[in-house]
Regions:
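Glycine-rich, low-complexity intrinsically disordered segments
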Residues: 1-146
Length: 146
């Protein structure tokens, strides 16, 4: 399934020309996770530890958001929120994943390239105080289920 992905980080503008997400940052790839330090392998009682929520990382083209993201990383700028949208592409696009982050800072930005690339890319990492994940189930035809 082909997808379109976009992120909005505070007031920073990207170069998306999508009619629904114009001005957001086009996302090429993203990664995020969390881990739990359970103790079930240490005998009876199997307690759960404290969750470790990782920073979210995304890959994007170098664009007009680049220098603003760099500046935000250098200054430790705090943004009220950031929102990542993943949408099924096609005639009837369906936004099926939405991750909203609150109290966001840019924790890293790395860029580079080689002569063989069409466009330069960069990786950006965000840290946040809280998050909300929303998921929209799809029906067999690719539309919204419920």
């Amino acid at each position: 399934m082909a997808v379109d992905m976009f992120i909005k980080v505070g007031t920073i503008e990207g170069e998306s020309v999508d009619k629904t997400h114009a001005g957001k940052i086009d996302v090429l790839a993203w990664s995020w996770g969390m881990s739990q330090s359970g103790t079930t392998h240490q005998g009876g009682g199997g307690g759960a530890g404290k969750v470790n929520v990782q920073d979210i990382s995304f890959t994007k083209y170098v664009d007009k958001s680049t220098t603003n993201l760099m500046s935000a990383c250098c200054k430790g700028t705090h943004f009220d929120d950031a929102v990542l949208i993943v949408r099924k592409a096609g005639d009837k696009p369906l936004e099926y994943i939405k991750i909203t982050m609150k109290e966001v800072i840019v924790t890293s930005l790395s860029t580079g390239g080689s002569g063989g690339e069409d466009r330069l890319t960069e990786n950006v990492t965000l840290n946040f105080a809280e998050f909300k994940v929303e998921y929209q189930e799809q029906n067999p035809k690719g539309g919204s289920k419920g």
